[in-house]
């Protein structure tokens, strides 16, 4: 809208940041923004990622990931996840802008990891308080290698070299709000450190089932020109892939670190 032509003042940016910390996900409909504004808005929160190692980018803007799905390129994020937790320092936030939205389907779900933690039984909270878990690339490796040729093998190996896996505390404390939250996700969390495979699988299976309850979720129906920002530290999300063979095009900028942390 017209706000991009006059810029966003520091007071307004601070209010958006404070609301993000409180509500975890913010939605702004009918925002006719330019790619330049998208990048500058994301930069107001912290340093941004460029370019993404897998996905293509918007022409002239290597910082903006182009997420384009249709019958020839079906979606691959239709499972619960927190972005790239297989890295030692996962990103702080994502700023996603809708360009082309199918008439039916293509919603996105978010869930609050702090609300999930708060709802856990006290005995289970005590059990997991000091546990750590291994996060690896999981099915994300399919983005690197979707055939058997040598180029894909090289790309996959480079992905393992860059990301490998990471170990994170199962329970974390938000650096700004001080809320505790459950830091695992079905896509990338593979093993509880120090547990047998059987015990680890049983615990993770219980927690994953608990985390996916609709009571902790919000479901958002996209319209074109909608801007959404979420705190990747304490949320999971799920992009529903129910719109094939129709087309869905999104632009995403990833904020690596929290400028105010």
Please tell me what each predicted stretch does.
Residues 10-227, 232-261:
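Non-heme Fe(II) oxygenase catalytic core, chiefly the N-lobe of the double-stranded beta-helix
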Residues 1-12:
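Short, small-residue-biased leader/transition segments that mark boundaries at the very start
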């Amino acid at each position: 809208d017209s706000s991009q032509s006059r810029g966003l003042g520091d007071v307004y940016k601070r209010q958006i940041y404070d609301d993000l910390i409180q509500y975890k996900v913010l939605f702004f409909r009918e925002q006719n923004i330019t790619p330049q504004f998208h990048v500058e808005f994301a930069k107001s929160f912290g340093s941004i990622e460029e370019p993404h190692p897998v996905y293509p980018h918007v022409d002239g803007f290597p910082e903006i990931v182009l997420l384009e799905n249709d019958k020839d390129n079906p979606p691959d994020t239709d499972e619960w996840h927190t972005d790239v937790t297989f890295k030692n320092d996962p990103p702080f936030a994502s700023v996603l802008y809708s360009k082309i939205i199918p008439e039916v389907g293509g919603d996105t779900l978010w869930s609050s990891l702090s609300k999930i933690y708060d709802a856990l039984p006290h005995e289970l909270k005590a059990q997991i308080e000091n546990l750590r878990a291994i996060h690896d690339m999981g099915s994300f490796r399919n983005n690197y290698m979707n055939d058997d040729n040598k180029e894909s093998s090289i790309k996959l190996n480079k992905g393992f070299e860059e990301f490998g896996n990471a170990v994170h505390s199962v329970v974390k404390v938000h650096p700004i709000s001080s809320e505790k939250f459950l830091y695992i996700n079905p896509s990338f969390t593979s093993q509880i450190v120090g547990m047998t495979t059987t015990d680890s699988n049983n615990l993770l299976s219980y927690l994953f089932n608990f985390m996916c309850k609709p009571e902790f979720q919000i479901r958002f129906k996209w319209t074109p020109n909608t801007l959404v920002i979420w705190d990747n530290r304490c949320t999971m999300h799920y992009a529903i892939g129910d719109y094939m063979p129709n087309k869905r095009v999104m632009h995403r900028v990833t904020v690596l670190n929290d400028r105010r942390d």
